Structures are given as structure tokens and as C-alpha cells.
Amino acid sequence: GCTGDPARRAGNEYLFHMLASANTETFKEQGVRKVVTHCPHCLNSLKNDYPEFGATLEVIHHSELLQKLIEEGKIVPQQKAEENVVFHDSCYLGRHNEIYDAPREVLNASTTSSPIKEIEQSRETGTCCGAGGACFLLEENTGTRMSHHRLDELMVNEPDTIAVSCPFCVLMLEDAVKAKNLNVQVKDISEMLVKKN
């Protein structure tokens, strides 16, 4: 089930507490000690919020697992992509949990444009895509959408691909690409390891 992060970010502490308590109880009943997340929001919630509910988990992001498996030779990228790739740092993976290198190492192992090109607004100075704070649930009506602003920053090097490590970032940036009618792909870093047909 859901970690409850979207509820907490939207201000519904009651629902978050219900979900976190139920999930913590399930983890204890099942003897869960380690969790691999695909979503940085879930990583942040499980790692930083759940201990107040009694959860004692080792929580890692899939980029960290992929990096480890690549280093151990257990995953070998099927075909290095010949793409100009830029990486978007997810707020909850980067600035909230200081995981910057793992996704870059995965990308560097899977593209010929290694090392990937960095933009000025990356790592600690990266800009949110607009999904943080449960904003992905809202309809923005005035001003420039955050996702459009972030896309403009990411497009400075004219990439073929924008690589991300968060499913919410994928949604926000894909919507911005469609709205601006740009010819660029948005992919999760795990997709970069898979051979293209």
C-alpha cells in the first residue's frame, strides 16, 4: 500500500498516521528489515518519518541498488545509449536525503555520453519539478508552472533524454514536454539500462 506521503504533504496528518501505523505493523508482522523503493517520496517517508511509528527499516532507493549491482557486475547495461542525457535531481532523493551520486553512476554506466552533462541547477541547487508538497494533485491556474520552468532549465544543453529517479518527476516533466511540444524523452534511470528495439 501507500506510505501515506502524499497525504502528509497535502496536510492530511490523520490519514498519514493511519497508513504509517498500519504499514509499520505489517512490516513487524512480516519481519521486514529492508525496503527498496522506486519513489524518493516513499524513501523519505519510510526512512525519516516512519521511525516515529516504531519502524526500524533499512531503506534504499532503486538507484542505490542498481549502482551496487552494476559495480558487482550483476547488471551489465545491454546497450550503451548514444544519447545526450541530462539528469533531474528529485527533491526527496537529493536535497532531502543527499543521494546524488548513485543515479549518476547508473546513467554513466548506461550511456555513451558519460559523464552525463550537468546543468547549473543540479544537485544541491536543483529546482523542483513541481510535484513536491503534493502539488501534482493540484491544478495550477496562474503564472508559470514549476514543471515548465524546470523543463526550460533542463533543456539548456538540448538533451535527447531527461533522466529522472522519481515517478512523480516523470509525470510532471512528461506533461511539460507535451504542453511545450518538445522532442525530448523523459525516462527513469532504470529504463536507461534496457536495450532498445
Residue ranges and their predicted role:
Residues G1-N197:
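Iron-sulfur cluster-binding electron-transfer modules in prokaryotic oxidoreductases
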